[in-house]
């Protein structure tokens, strides 16, 4: 009997640890989830700095969206294409603090650089994810992201 309880307890521990790994995260209401992250499209237009500040106020660890895989890009492009009437939206890549060093507003580095560096902030097209630099003082819709 003791062995049965021990084995049953062991299986319960394994089940609980596995169920909490990837499937255990959830996003707040009106946020979409993808690969342990939560995303939300905001239709109101703001400058890059105001949009980043707004994102940080939405949830702990939230910033303008950063991209780290083509699958993530596809997920966000689909979201923005469906919900935004505008063609462009802010993304978190910028070189505001260091002209020679592009980074995402969450502090991570872009894995690739496929844009012309005319301005310090980046926008993405809603239908094909082409990145373009834009004056940070322009106003666009935006997407916020945080790790669940």
UniProtKB/Swiss-Prot annotation:
It is found in: Secreted. Gene3D superfamilies: Mannose-Binding Protein A, subunit A. InterPro entries: C-type_lectin-like, C-type_lectin-like/link_sf, C-type_lectin/snaclec_domain, C-type_lectin_CS, CTDL_fold. Disulfide bonds join 27-38, 55-144, 121-136. Residues 1-23 form the signal peptide. Keywords: Disulfide bond, Hemostasis impairing toxin, Platelet aggregation activating toxin, Secreted, Signal, Toxin. Expressed by the venom gland. Residues 34-148 form the C-type lectin domain. GO terms for molecular function: toxin activity. GO terms for cellular component: extracellular region. Belongs to the snaclec family. Snake venom lectin that activates platelets by binding to the platelet collagen receptor glycoprotein VI (GP6). The indirect activation of integrin alpha-IIb/beta-3 (ITGA2B/ITGB3) also induced by the toxin is upstream the cytoskeletal translocation of GPIb, FcRgamma (FCER1G) and 14-3-3zeta (YWHAZ). Tetramer of heterodimers of alpha and beta subunits (alphabeta)(4); disulfide-linked. Negative results: does not act by binding to GPIb. This is Snaclec convulxin subunit beta.
